[in-house]
Amino acid sequence: MKRMVLFGSGGWIPSHSRETMCVPVEIGANLFLLDAGTGMRRFKSRIGSGLLDRHDKISILLSHYHLDHIIGISYLPLNFTGKRILIYAPEPAANGQEPEEILARLFDAPVFFPLSGFPCEVEIRAIREGEHEIDGVRVAVHPQSHTVPSVAYRIEDFLCYATDRRPTPDLVQYAAGVEYLLHDASFDESLFASITDPEARAEAMWGHSTAQDAARLARDAGAGHLGLVHLSPSMKETEYPALLEEARKIFPTTFLPREGRWIRFE
């Protein structure tokens, strides 16, 4: 069995309809979480509790250290008691700091209580660019251009997760032929039509991509399906279909994820 469910597909802050990034991926006996945003709260739901009933070990793959992608680590004491949690975090980290140092400093007094005091076993492992095998599953790590060090993850040939990134062409080869691509779609291209300089455009977008950027990349990579993620919380849910329509003009098999709905891989 290979499937995923989006518990969070929004960016920056949760909205009334979307949490920030968290994507559980179930591969047989393995459970991976792509990022740990506020979508982690959905482990209190029926789907979430069912996942935890089936898995005692969970591997969390962090794309980077911005709060909207890691704040859900603070939810571990609520839902993950007695579980073994392996947190894979990109290295080299921001400012040359080790992943364990960054996370231990954040989840410690006076901001929170230390990871060592969580009622679950938490282990932090640095993960570098390149090919890895985690519990028999092939995971490829690819660096991204963002405002801080960020990475994309490719899980075998069925999923590529690339959020919080500028639209650089190097991901085309990395995502080539993947069944599902989940890609940053924080903005609509029309917002930046007047900015012609690429560097100025990238700065205005805070290291993110447009839905059209995502669609072009999916098309060029020969992906099977494109899911638009890291959606802007400044947009209303009723505005997202227009974003989808623009992306579909470039890549017809684009979709807007519905949080809490399973997607099965071939």
What role is predicted for each listed range?
Residues 1-161, 241-265:
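Binuclear metal-dependent hydrolase catalytic cores
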Residues 168-259:
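Cap/insert and terminal regions of metallo-dependent hydrolase folds
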Residues 227, 265-266:
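Conserved N-terminal glycine/acidic-rich loop preference
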Residues 34, 63, 163, 183-185, ...:
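Active-site flanking residues adjacent to catalytic metal/cofactor-binding acidic residues
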Residues 146-147, 160, 166-168, 187-189:
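Short, catalytically relevant binding-site loops at active-site mouths
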